[in-house]
Structures are given as structure tokens and as C-alpha cells.
């Protein structure tokens, strides 16, 4: 976006860890970047969107008014990775289902202009991802959210990695949702932590849920899909995958 004014939306805030959301808002404020935590399902803070934009564009709007251009539409663009709720956010703003919404990446195929209230016109863009992830962990966490298409991912491995993250950061969510212990599993070493520990948790969940196949073996594929679905739809509880690194919190 170059030097153009930017408003960062922290969407799906009602599914995020509220304490970490505060950290992110503080982080962006210290960088001089305006940020707003929103949620499209509840409508939280969506009404503040126009006010934040007008604050950012105050100087530009004053210049346009001075030139007698007060009636011109203010054009803005929304960009982001796939599956973060861009279309749902637009629908909230527009008051109707103008943008197609599905819980999978790649639903918005082309650019489209949407007329909003208060003189704004918004350009909706398809979600975009980096062609390559230098940090494997970044790619994994994006895959957790569904930003990467599931049909190119190993869902069992993905669920194991997610469960390992949850064990280290939100063990109470696993225990509450699935009724299993997490504190009696020790990792073999750092290289296998996401496979060995995560797979043990996945098997426990499958056994607890009764996901069994012939011979009494655990259907770990079904367990993996269940874990990923319940993480993505918020059933597991409120959690955040990453904290800001540039700010120290004690």
C-alpha cells in the first residue's frame, strides 16, 4: 500500500484471546499504526470503522472540501490473506449479503466495488498469500486457520501440530473440550514434538469421542478433521496463535 493511510483490522476478535488482542493493539499503536479489533458475527466495533477511517483521512478530506470536491466518493481497498472474514466484514458494513461468504479460502475470485455508507466505496480483493514461506511455522499457522487449502495439506499432521501448540499454550481448552489429560505426555525431543506428542493427544481425542474403525483401531483422520473444524469455528474456545514479538510483556 506504499505511503497510503492504512487501518489494520484484527477480525474475529470474539474468537481470539482477549489479553493477546490487547497486546496486538498496543503493538500497532507503538508503531504508529491505527488498528481496530472487530468481529463480524457479533458486530463488535464494526460501527467504529468509519470513524477510524475519517481520522486517518482527515487531512485529505479537508483538502477535497477546500477544492469543492466534498461530494466525491472516498475509495478504499480491503486486502488480506484468505479466510479471515473480509467478505463477512463487507457484508456487515453494507447491511446485506453483497459478498459471497464461505468458510474456505478462495471464495472471492475477482475485484468488486461495493458502495458503503458515509460516502465510501470499497474495493474487495481476493485473498492473497506469499508464494513461499521462509518460516515453516508461519505456513503451519496459516494452514491452521484455513488460509491454505486443506486439500493440499496432511490434516492429521496439521491437527497434531495444532494440538501440540494448544498443549503448550492453552492446555485447559483441550482438557475442557475433549475431557482428556495433557500434563502426562512428555516430548521425546524438539524435532518430534509435534508428531509424537500431538499424535498421542489426537489418539486420546479419537478414543474419547468413539472414533473407532473395525478392530477397535482409532480413526485418527476423523479425529483430526474434528479438531481442525472445532478450532476454526471457535468451539474450542478463545485463543490466539501468535503474540507480537517486538513488544516485551512480563
What name fits each language-model region?
Residues 1-7, 13, 19, 34, ...:
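Helix-rich effector regions associated with P-loop NTPase G domains
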Residues 7-8, 77:
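A structural signal for isolated positions on well-ordered beta-strands in alpha/beta enzyme cores
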Residues 16-75:
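Canonical P-loop GTPase G-domain recognition
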Residues 24-27, 95, 138-142:
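Glycine-rich, phosphate-binding/catalytic loops in enzymes
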Residues 71-73, 96, 111:
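Short coil/loop residues immediately preceding or within conserved phosphate-binding loops
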Residues 76-95:
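Glycine-rich phosphate-binding P-loop
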Amino acid at each position: 500500500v506504499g505511503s497510503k493511510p492504512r487501518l489494520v483490522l484484527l477480525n474475529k476478535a470474539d474468537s481470539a484471546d482477549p489479553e493477546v488482542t490487547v497486546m496486538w493493539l498496543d503493538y500497532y499503536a507503538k508503531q504508529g499504526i491505527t488498528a481496530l479489533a472487530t468481529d463480524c458475527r457479533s458486530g463488535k466495533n464494526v460501527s467504529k470503522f468509519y470513524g477510524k477511517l475519517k481520522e486517518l483521512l482527515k487531512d485529505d478530506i479537508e483538502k477535497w472540501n477546500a477544492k469543492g470536491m466534498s461530494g466525491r466518493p472516498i475509495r478504499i481497498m480491503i486486502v488480506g490473506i484468505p479466510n479471515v472474514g473480509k467478505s463477512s466484514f463487507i457484508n456487515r458494513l453494507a447491511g446485506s449479503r453483497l459478498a459471497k461468504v464461505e468458510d474456505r479460502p478462495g471464495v472471492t475470485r475477482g475485484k468488486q466495488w461495493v458502495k458503503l455508507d458515509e460516502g465510501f466505496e470499497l474495493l474487495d480483493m481476493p485473498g492473497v498469500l506469499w508464494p513461499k514461506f521462509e518460516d515453516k511455522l508461519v505456513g503451519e499457522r496459516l494452514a491452521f486457520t484455513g488460509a491454505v487449502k486443506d486439500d493440499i495439506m496432511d490434516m492429521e499432521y496439521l491437527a497434531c501440530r495444532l494440538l501440540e501448540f494448544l498443549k503448550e499454550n492453552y492446555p485447559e481448552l483441550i482438557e475442557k473440550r475433549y475431557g482428556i489429560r495433557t500434563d502426562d505426555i512428555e516430548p521425546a525431543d524438539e524435532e518430534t514434538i509435534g508428531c509424537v506428542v500431538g499424535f498421542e493427544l489426537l489418539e486420546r481425542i479419537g478414543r474419547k469421542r468413539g472414533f473407532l474403525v473395525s478392530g477397535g483401531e482409532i480413526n485418527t483422520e476423523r479425529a483430526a478433521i474434528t479438531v481442525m473444524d472445532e478450532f476454526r469455528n471457535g468451539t474450542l474456545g478463545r485463543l490466539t496463535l501468535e503474540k507480537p514479538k517486538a513488544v516485551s510483556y512480563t
